[in-house]
A protein has these predicted regions:
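Intrinsically disordered, low-complexity terminal regions
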Residues: 1-149
Length: 149
């Protein structure tokens, strides 16, 4: 009986794991406006501050799109995987925009790429683990706050 229960436990756990198939695909959707971003894991997060309608462009292995979770609550955009444990993917790239940004919360081995100057009174960045910020432009007009989560 114990062996049967252990077998059921391990087979249930295995069913929750998924790996990318190596074939990248990109999907683009329109989203509600946000002013804060929260993400976790190995991700390249490209952000642009603009007046255009907010959208997200997601590039990931084609079989992983159903597990990508995008949620906006109280103007906080949360991005990650949901519904399965993703063990491996080829790339996980997000491109998005909003009118302004006041906070970034990142955890994991994340890259945050600012593709435009960020204008505002204050930008707060909370990061855990390995976090990299890059920009080819002047990144911030205003106050820049960086600290642990």
């Amino acid at each position: 009986m114990i062996a049967f229960l252990m077998g059921m436990f391990f087979s249930t756990q295995a069913a929750d794991h998924v790996k990318g198939n190596g074939k990248l695909s990109t999907k683009k959707i329109t989203i509600d406006d946000f002013n804060a971003i929260k993400f976790d894991g190995v991700i390249d997060f490209n952000y642009e501050q603009s007046e255009s309608t907010p959208h997200i462009e997601i590039t990931v292995d084609e079989n992983l799109h159903p597990y990508v979770n995008i949620d906006i609550q109280d103007r906080v955009l949360t991005v990650g995987f949901k519904g399965a444990k993703v063990d491996h993917f080829t790339k996980f790239i997000f491109k998005t925009n909003s009118k302004w940004l006041k906070e970034v919360k990142a955890s994991g081995n994340a890259n945050f790429i600012a593709n435009s100057p960020l204008k505002g009174d204050e930008l707060k960045i909370n990061a855990r683990y390995s976090f990299f910020i890059s920009s080819s432009k002047a990144i911030m007009e205003g106050t820049w706050l960086y600290g642990p989560k």
